[in-house]
Design a protein with these regions (language model features):
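Core alpha/beta nucleotide-donor-binding catalytic domains of modification enzymes
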Residues: 1-137
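Non-catalytic, surface-exposed connector residues within folded enzymatic/regulatory domains
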Residues: 24, 129, 149-152, 213-216
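Active-site catalytic microenvironments for nucleophilic, acid-base chemistry
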Residues: 48, 74, 142, 205-208
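Internal, active-site/partner-interface "lid" segment
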Residues: 125-133, 153-163
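Inter-helical turn/loop segments and adjacent helix faces that build the functional surface
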Residues: 142-154
Length: 252
């Protein structure tokens, strides 16, 4: 990478981190700890060069793999990456942009070949050591072979349709005024919703309060706060709770 950067007269920054050590220290998966380490590296680089945004090279093939990966983990809907996301790293905001999300790997390779631009692949992407890599290297090629066609375009189309549906549902929920003045869910109103709308309302509330990895199973447990009077508290990730008290549902 350094040689390529020098060839094109570009600045380069490299970093090294022991992901297995981070897994032992923090208890996270390999994917989670590697992602957190990357975000920390990006934040350090942004601070060094006084940048407010960092551009990433995720492309359409990566997006399809992400949607499939999240679906198999039990995500709520067909969840993929967003063009722009903001993360908190050591108490400071880091904005990540993905301008190539609608561009396929094939299109990128064709562009590089047409312009005779040398590039470097990340060698770790060819190793079947993570779930995502195995999806890319084993599962997706097998599905392509079974169906006799490339499956990524179909996954991407389904994800776009799902996102449009979620946006429409969000508009409907916003008009229903489901929150009290303190921003808590008002139980008498949310209890009247259909199960599908109620799950969407809870999902929106959790997401707005920074809850990650919102699965179907988690939403089902959160719904029990509304349907089962005997339940008053649900465990959330990162040591937080969703509680029901005085006809209000809120995070603590």
């Amino acid at each position: 990478m350094r040689r390529l950067a020098k060839k094109y007269e570009l600045l380069s920054e490299t970093g090294r981190v022991n992901v297995p050590d981070l897994m032992l220290q923090n208890g996270g998966s390999m994917e989670l700890e590697a992602r957190n380490a990357r975000h920390q590296f990006f934040a350090d680089c942004a601070r060094t060069y006084r940048c407010s945004r960092v551009l990433l090279a995720h492309h359409a093939d990566d997006q399809a793999e992400t949607v499939l990966f999240n679906l198999l983990r039990g995500s709520y809907g067909l969840k993929g990456m967003h063009f722009s996301t903001t993360h908190q790293v050591n108490g400071k905001e880091l904005q990540l942009l993905r301008p190539l999300l609608k561009t396929t790997r094939e299109d990128i390779n064709n562009y590089l070949a047409a312009h005779k631009i040398a590039f470097r692949d990340d060698a770790s992407n060819a190793e079947g050591i993570t779930t995502r890599n195995r999806l890319r290297l084993e599962a997706i090629p097998l599905l392509n072979d079974i169906l006799g066609r490339e499956i990524r375009p179909a996954i991407l189309k389904a994800a776009v349709a799902s996102q449009a549906q979620q946006q429409a549902i969000a508009s409907i929920l916003e008009s229903m005024q489901l929150y009290d003045p303190q921003g808590r869910l008002f139980l008498p109103k949310i209890a009247k919703l259909s199960p599908a709308l109620r799950s969407s309302a809870i999902h929106s509330y959790l997401k707005a309060h920074g809850v990650s990895n919102i699965t179907q199973e988690l939403l089902a447990r959160c719904n029990s706060l509304i349907t089962d009077p005997a339940i008053a508290k649900i465990n959330l990730p990162a040591g937080r709770f969703l509680r029901r008290r005085e006809k209000r549902i809120f995070i603590s």
